[in-house]
């Protein structure tokens, strides 16, 4: 078997969910499990949080159906709403909390004539300008839906654009926009993503939406996961499968982009971009070999990558390699690659086996 595995610590996810709840006592929290629980395995994560989570949040009906099959009673928030008119009947059967983010969705919901009333979340475009009603339109839709028989709860939701950058002026503007609608009669309110859960108590409202923090990656630009008390959930582990000596002036990898400036010892690792490791990872990106730091040398290949082991003479074929995990944070690797931990975690592909610890 190819020596590559993503090991997921489900107890870390439970710890991180509990931390979110401790940040906002008496509030409830939707555990965000979209995109296969950010690459960690939705089935396993939902099962691990079955008795702890107040609800779950997903991006599409297919994800919602998977969660409902695992949890008969949890609230399931459909973050982007229904994409087609035909989906409303299934949303009703699944008893979803339904986001309505535009007039087209609102009209389709009214036309669906559902037999069972649903919890409806009107989405405010508070400044991100991605989804949602402007304040005036949202007020009009509140008036249309407040007493509609198809609506069980009428709720308010929005999403921050820059909460990861503390004290960003847009965050305060978005909060003020949200608060400006609370003269309306809403049953529940939700605004706080992971960054806001951790740093903006005024945004906690009734329902939190912890996402990336559940998986032990920091949502903040200036604080590490460890500083926030988060535990990493995924370790991506591979193995050294080859070693060779490379002379000064010789190159490594596709494009011959890495040139040895000294006699070099190069190791080949059983992980590549077809596994989700970014092809754009530059030379110098950190890895752990046998628990000690090494760096990438040359371009990442489809199934392999190369590391410079010149300073690790004790390294041997078969040694374990940690691409990220408990010893090397996914956020540090992401920074080296010019991206975010969100992307690295969610892009680990299906051909990488997942193993779970509890």
From Swiss-Prot:
Pfam families: Ala_racemase_C (PF00842), Ala_racemase_N (PF01168). GO terms for cellular component: cytosol. The modification N6-(pyridoxal phosphate)lysine is found at residue 34. Keywords: Cell shape, Cell wall biogenesis/degradation, Isomerase, Peptidoglycan synthesis, Pyridoxal phosphate. Its EC number is 5.1.1.1. Pathway: Amino-acid biosynthesis; D-alanine biosynthesis; D-alanine from L-alanine: step 1/1; Cell wall biogenesis; peptidoglycan biosynthesis. Substrate binds at residues 130, 302. InterPro entries: Ala_racemase, Ala_racemase/Decarboxylase_C, Ala_racemase_C, Ala_racemase_N, Ala_racemase_pyridoxalP-BS, PLP-binding_barrel. The keyword Cell wall biogenesis/degradation applies. Gene3D superfamilies: Alanine racemase, Lyase, Ornithine Decarboxylase, Chain A, domain 1. It is an enzyme of class 5 (isomerase). Its cofactor is pyridoxal 5'-phosphate. It comes from the Bacteria. SMART domains: Ala_racemase_C (SM01005). Signal peptide: none annotated. It catalyses: L-alanine = D-alanine. GO terms for molecular function: alanine racemase activity; pyridoxal phosphate binding. Coiled coil: none annotated. The keyword Coiled coil does not apply. PROSITE patterns: ALANINE_RACEMASE. The active site is at residues 34, 254. Belongs to the alanine racemase family. Catalyzes the interconversion of L-alanine and D-alanine. Provides the D-alanine required for cell wall biosynthesis. This is Alanine racemase, biosynthetic. The lineage of its organism: Bacteria, Pseudomonadati, Pseudomonadota, Gammaproteobacteria, Pseudomonadales. The gene is alr.
């Amino acid at each position: 078997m190819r020596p590559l595995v993503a090991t997921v610590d489900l107890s870390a996810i439970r710890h991180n969910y509990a931390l979110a709840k401790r940040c906002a006592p008496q509030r409830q929290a939707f555990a965000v499990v979209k995109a296969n629980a950010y690459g960690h395995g939705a089935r396993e994560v939902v099962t691990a949080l079955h008795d702890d989570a107040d609800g779950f949040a997903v991006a599409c009906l297919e994800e919602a159906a998977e969660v409902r099959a695992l949890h008969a009673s949890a609230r399931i928030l459909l973050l982007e709403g229904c994409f087609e008119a035909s989906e409303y009947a299934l949303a009703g059967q699944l008893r979803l909390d339904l986001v309505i983010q535009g007039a087209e969705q609102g009209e389709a919901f009214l036309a669906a004539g559902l037999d069972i009333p649903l919890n409806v979340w009107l989405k405010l475009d508070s400044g991100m300008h991605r989804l949602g009603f402007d304040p005036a339109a949202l007020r009009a839709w509140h008036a249309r839906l407040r007493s509609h028989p198809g609506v069980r709860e009428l709720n308010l939701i929005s999403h921050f654009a820059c909460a990861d950058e503390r004290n960003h002026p847009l965050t305060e503007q978005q909060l003020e926009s949200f608060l400006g609608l609370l003269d309306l009669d809403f049953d529940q309110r939700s605004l706080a993503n992971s960054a806001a859960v951790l740093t903006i108590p005024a945004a906690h409202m009734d329902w939190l939406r912890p996402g990336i923090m559940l998986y032990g990656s920091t949502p903040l630009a200036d604080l590490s996961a460890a500083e926030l008390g988060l535990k990493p959930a995924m370790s991506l582990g591979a193995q050294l499968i080859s070693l060779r000596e490379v002379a000064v002036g010789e190159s490594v990898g596709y494009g011959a982009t890495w040139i040895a400036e000294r006699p070099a010892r190069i190791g080949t690792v059983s992980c590549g971009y077809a596994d989700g490791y970014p092809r754009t990872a530059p030379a110098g990106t950190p890895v752990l070999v046998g628990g000690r730091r090494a760096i990438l040398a040359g371009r990442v290949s489809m199934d392999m990558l190369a590391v410079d082991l010149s300073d690790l003479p004790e390294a041997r074929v078969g040694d374990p390699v940690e691409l990220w995990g408990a010893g090397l944070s996914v956020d540090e690797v992401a920074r080296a690659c010019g991206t975010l931990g969100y992307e690295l975690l969610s892009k680990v592909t299906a051909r990488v086996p997942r193993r779970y610890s509890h």
